[in-house]
């Protein structure tokens, strides 16, 4: 009864916690936030700059440009948490930004995770979200979330295929009858494309470029055809 009452005053939130970008959607309002999964901290203390607000776009602007005392961290690697405390700080910032500081009741949160992660890695996501301010946390496998979002008939007795290329992982899944029949997750994805472009530019043209330039090249001239 109490949980139902709290639900009337809180929000239901979906989070796509990616290696490169994090998206936050709120029920009835759609996607409210799409920002880089980057946090700027002071070296030695891991204190998030700007009173905990140097996250997302603000932090990404510091990538490759930060002084020696500041580090721009991406707390997820290959689709999983590599820095628990920084992930917690990042989630806390994104939840606050998406829901507004005035809300008293913490949100219920669904988080999309790679299908191939371990039980320990899932536990890390749950703990980070709870410590960041979520009232209840549920996990859904990314291929399933992608299939639902794309409007595929995943609940019907027919096969639907999803290829989800993220920043740290690529997932290929076949779904039918609201279940994943088979799925393969490989830790080769967008970040590796960016790195390959950087190496190619250096080797072929003796030109050094940064992560943001490499990503822009990938987006503007890349093709899946």
What residues fall within each predicted segment?
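Nucleotide/phosphate-binding catalytic cleft detector across ATP-hydrolyzing
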Residues: 1-165, 173-225
């Amino acid at each position: 009864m109490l949980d139902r009452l709290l639900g009337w005053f809180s929000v239901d939130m979906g989070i796509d916690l990616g290696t490169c970008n994090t998206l936050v959607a709120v029920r009835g309002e759609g996607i409210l936030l799409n920002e880089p999964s980057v946090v700027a901290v002071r070296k030695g203390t891991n204190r998030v700059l700007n009173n905990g607000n140097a996250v997302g776009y603000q932090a990404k602007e510091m990538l490759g440009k930060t002084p020696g005392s500041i580090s721009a961290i991406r707390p997820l690697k290959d689709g999983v948490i590599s820095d628990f405390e920084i992930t917690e700080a990042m989630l806390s910032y994104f939840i606050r930004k998406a829901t507004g500081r005035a809300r008293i009741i913490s949100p219920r949160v669904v988080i999309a995770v790679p299908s191939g992660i371990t039980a320990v890695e899932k536990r890390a996501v749950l703990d980070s979200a709870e410590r960041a301010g979520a009232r209840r946390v549920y996990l859904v496998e990314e291929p399933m979330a992608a299939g639902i979002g794309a409007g595929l008939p995943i609940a019907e007795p027919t096969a639907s295929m999803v290829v989800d290329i993220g920043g740290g992982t690529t997932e290929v899944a076949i779904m039918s009858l609201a279940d994943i029949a088979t799925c393969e997750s490989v830790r080769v994805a967008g970040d590796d494309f960016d790195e390959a472009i950087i190496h190619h530019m250096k080797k072929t043209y003796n030109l050094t470029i940064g992560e943001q330039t490499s990503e822009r090249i990938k987006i503007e001239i890349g093709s899946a055809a």
